[in-house]
């Protein structure tokens, strides 16, 4: 179980460094955020099954629902930015302010 937790934490850290490194493009940032959410989902499911905490067994599913909503909003923002400006640079987000 320790090796599984270590691999999941390493996947989360790898996705976090991807967010920090590839923050100039919105698509790369969204993909790294999805990797972070999936590693959190796997970690929560593994901890719940390991410690037999079945009273909170819906929490990973709720996390997946919020992750899907976040991905939908992010992709809608990506389509809007790419249609307006022709690229997915994050610097264009400052231009959307009123």
Swiss-Prot record:
Disulfides per UniProt: none
Assigned keywords, A-Z: Electron transport, Membrane, Mitochondrion, Mitochondrion inner membrane, NAD, Respiratory chain, Translocase, Transmembrane, Transmembrane helix, Transport, Ubiquinone
Reaction catalysis annotation: a ubiquinone + NADH + 5 H(+)(in) = a ubiquinol + NAD(+) + 4 H(+)(out)
Compartments where located: Mitochondrion inner membrane
Source taxon at top rank: Eukaryota
Keyword Cell division included in the entry's annotation: no
EC number: 7.1.1.2
Transmembrane segments: 1-21, 36-56, 61-81
Primary localization: mitochondrion
One GO BP: ATP synthesis coupled electron transport
GO cellular component term of the entry, any: mitochondrial inner membrane
UniProt KW Metal-binding keyword: no
Protein topology in the membrane: Multi-pass membrane protein
GO molecular-function terms, A-Z: NADH dehydrogenase (ubiquinone) activity
Function: Core subunit of the mitochondrial membrane respiratory chain NADH dehydrogenase (Complex I) which catalyzes electron transfer from NADH through the respiratory chain, using ubiquinone as an electron acceptor. Part of the enzyme membrane arm which is embedded in the lipid bilayer and involved in proton translocation.
Protein family: Belongs to the complex I subunit 4L family.
Subunit comment: Core subunit of respiratory chain NADH dehydrogenase (Complex I) which is composed of 45 different subunits.
Protein name: NADH-ubiquinone oxidoreductase chain 4L
Phylogenetic classification of the source organism: Eukaryota, Metazoa, Chordata, Craniata, Vertebrata
């Amino acid at each position: 179980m320790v090796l599984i937790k270590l691999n999941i934490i390493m996947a989360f850290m790898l996705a976090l460094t991807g967010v920090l490194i590839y923050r100039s493009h919105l698509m790369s940032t969204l993909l790294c955020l999805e990797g972070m959410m999936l590693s959190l989902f796997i970690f929560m499911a593994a901890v719940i099954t390991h410690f037999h905490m079945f009273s909170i067994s819906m929490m990973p599913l709720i996390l997946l629902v919020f992750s899907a909503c976040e991905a939908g909003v992010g992709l809608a923002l990506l389509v809007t930015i790419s249609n307006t400006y022709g690229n997915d640079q994050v610097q264009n987000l400052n231009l959307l302010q009123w």
